[in-house]
Amino acid sequence: MNNPHKFDSNSLSKWMDSILAKEKWFVEPRYNVPKSTQDTISVGVLSPFCYDFSTIALGSLSIYHSINRDPNCPGIADRILVYDPITDENYNIFTNLKLEENLKTLERRIPLNKLDLICISLTGTDSITTILQILKLGGIPLLRSERQSGNYPLILAGGPGCINPEIFADFFDFFSMGDGCILSKKIVQAIHKLKIFDKKKKITGKDIFETIEDNSSLYVPELYNFTFKGEQITNIEPYKKINLIAQAVDPPIEYTQVSLFSNGQTAVIVPSRGCKNNCGYCLLTGQGYREADVKPLLEYVDKYIECGINSIVVNAASSTQYKEISILLDKLAEKIEKASFPIQVYLGSLCFDELTDEILKKIDRLKAFNHTYSLYTNGKLQKVMALAPEHGSLDILRGLGRKLNSWNILNSIDKAKKIGVYNFTLYLIVGFLSETAKDREQTAALASAIADKVYENNGKVTLKINPIIPTPGTACQRMGMPSVEDYKLYLKEIENGVKSRIGEERYKEQISIVSLPEERLLVESIIDRADRRISKIILKVLDYRSKGKSIDELELKKWVEESDFTWEHLTGQISLDAILPWQMINLINPKHEEKILTTLQNRINEEK
């Protein structure tokens, strides 16, 4: 385990050549349009995924295309991935990996440490160790302070995993809050301008902030001085008067809604972004709901079919909220039926309250019953519908601001049965403030009722049950979270509740419970709401994972005890008057936040 895994860089280069040769592009020219300047800025766009999945991750690809498709942007972007040859069968980077030379970009084979800018899209906080491993393999010092003395690239990070940028403040130079297409181009232009003025000058995040005219969505850690007293933040002093950081909203752009290229098999259309519902625990609530016009989406479907694409992903938080969903499904079906080869359609999430008989018939015509996550897993193709009732207790859900009645899902099950869908994946959450065993009994009762409805059809029900991990940027961001022991107890309670209703034998036949991996739960629970001092623990997590060592709760608690934090501070409830590490970007209405916490706290008082 401790022996270095040596890798032949020439083999990696040949693999890069082979996958680029297989790519199918739906726009010309490939990669980038001709640039109007000779002194182009070299950019790397880093995705924490292996190749196939990276081709449908439009978040990072939209940054890549925004730089490359604009003739007036003085930069050219290459992709940086978790290259398949440097990973094991589970797509984890080989332990103790040693390369003959620094890791390079996919297209132009530029060593990562020779780039001018690296843009990173983090889908979640747990992917930070993968990102840091890639940077390290590219010869880049991980700490921002260590890069000040050398000629290293600036690093811009964004995405849902950076909603609390302070946890990564010691690693990255600046953060894009909200959408990043327009801002990333402005940063490229600023670097270009500063380099022309003084080629030897060491450019900092502060320089970029002062050069960009509209910097309202750019968070630069070095511009904020934090004062700590023990584990608490007592003051945040900006470098100069800085308004609250706003969430950037890019205008509708083609490459945020469709794939401009494919791995030769799969392409994506994105009919909508965000969600219309206003649930206090969901990050999608704060992103704003946006829709794409149906016509250009369908035009790209034609291009996909013409190029022989056999998998099309319709990716949205809730496809059924899209106002033109009927037209989209009908036209998709018409085009696929005319194709000379079979095409599999994968749908994103469906809102059970919005499922009508008409929509289900259209989905049935498409045979689009497989959730997107099954595309690059070993998930067997079968009629499976993924729905998110979240919880069985209506009282809990009302307290969280969720207006949907989770028990209405039973009506959707009845409708789905009419078109032959008997297998369901249900997304559920446990561990909310004020939640009791009686509340979890309601979740068990709901799962049992669904199992009853599909039993005679040999239907299966998968319960994907996650603990509440209060997310910065949501109205539940100050809520405490359950311990690993409590989480396991809650899962057992739901399991026993279902068994008591349908019996042991039927439970074995029909029900499976999928939990969040323990290590991921532990890591996310302590870093998600921390401040920049958490970087020392992140580096320890990185060291363990790089060596292939698992992290248990005992080890993690030891690291926390040796830090400036306590376990209770990182995982417990945060008072309403406490200064949040992400205070400068906190856009949550304090009255809404207080209302949710007070409502749930009142439930506790009533129980007493």
Task: Describe each region flagged by the PLM.
Residues 2-169, 174:
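Acidic, glycine-rich segments characteristic of secretory precursors and extracytoplasmic regions
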Residues 11-42, 52, 221-271:
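N-terminal [4Fe-4S]-dependent radical SAM core
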Residues 45-52, 117, 302-425, 430-460:
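Conserved SAM/AdoMet-binding glycine-rich loop
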Residues 57, 260-295:
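Canonical Radical SAM [4Fe-4S] cluster-binding loop centered on the CxxxCxxC motif
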Residues 60-62, 135, 170-175, 191-192, ...:
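Short secondary-structure boundary/capping segments
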Residues 95-233, 472-531, 538-549, 593:
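Glycine-rich beta-alpha loop elements in corrinoid/cobalamin-binding modules
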Residues 273, 303, 307-308, 341, ...:
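Segments forming glycine/polar-rich beta-alpha architectures that bind adenosine-containing cofactors
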